[in-house]
Amino acid sequence: MNKIFLILVFFFGSINISNAELNRIVVGNKDAKITIIAYESLTCSHCADFHKDIYPQLKKDFIDTGLAKIEFRHFPLDVAAFNASKISQCKSNESLKILNSLYSNQQEWVRGNTVEEINGNLKKFIKSQGFEINFEKCINNKEIEDFVLNDRIEG
């Protein structure tokens, strides 16, 4: 058992996330005294409910007033959420917009019986929203993959 644990620590401990191109999705004053960290899975209906119903009021009362900032981190619960998380990180200048769009329209892209079918829905959805992302290049990007996995491990 100890050998397996050491192997897992070595494997997961060696993930490199020091890529300057990848930024956390943070909303609010960077100097706010309170930091809210939200670990979310893009296929989780409760996470989507939080993002649509709770987050706007939280933003209005605490983030927009400068009292707090919120940092969205990835906690994919399945392969579809993992790929959607990678997509949300592909264009750092649009990450929050992509995240909002994925949660607001979760039922449009999350349905399907296979990962391939869901990926197809996700690809069509991203294109229909006007995001110019090379889907295959993005979901196969090792640095983005490591960034998302590191969030998952930390969470």
Language model: regions and residue ranges:
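Cysteine-centric redox/oxidoreductase cores and disulfide-bonded domains
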Residues: P76-G155
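Extracytoplasmic thiol/disulfide redox context detector
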Residues: M1-F82, K127, E143-G155
